[in-house]
Amino acid sequence: GLSVEINNTDAEGRLILADCLTYVGKYKPSHVIDMATLTGAVVIALGRHASGVMANDQNLANMIIESGEESGDRAWQLPLWDEHQSCTKTKYADLANIGGGREAGTIHAAAFLSKFTNDYKWAHIDIAATASYSTPVKAGTGRPVPLISELLLSKRLN
């Protein structure tokens, strides 16, 4: 496994997801999509009108975005470029759980997760901006259930 330096204890969700992404690999999946209210930074990037998508496979990202458009549960792709991978570097472990600085927080979280997805096509959907209403009443939106339902029922993944 990989060793992880904990630079921020508030970035614990990505550690749980990393364990899940590692564990699921033993089942040799063709595709894995994880969803989480992972970063507040996605609210800054996209507002509350779309979930953020990052993927190691462009076709999978496209299928998610298309399913979001068709279901009305929009998602928007953020880049996961090689340059973003450097945010996980540290001298004390294989990876750091959070990148330095304020920029690209959502992307840096996905860059960390991507280190655990080498054996399958993977996408992360950050639903921190879309999972709940803040006004007029605090409540869950049910998102991304419409997007995922459309993706599965459309058989795009086959």
Q: How would you name each of these model-derived features?
A:
Residues G1-N158:
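A generic structural signal for tightly packed, nonpolar segments enriched in small/aliphatic residues
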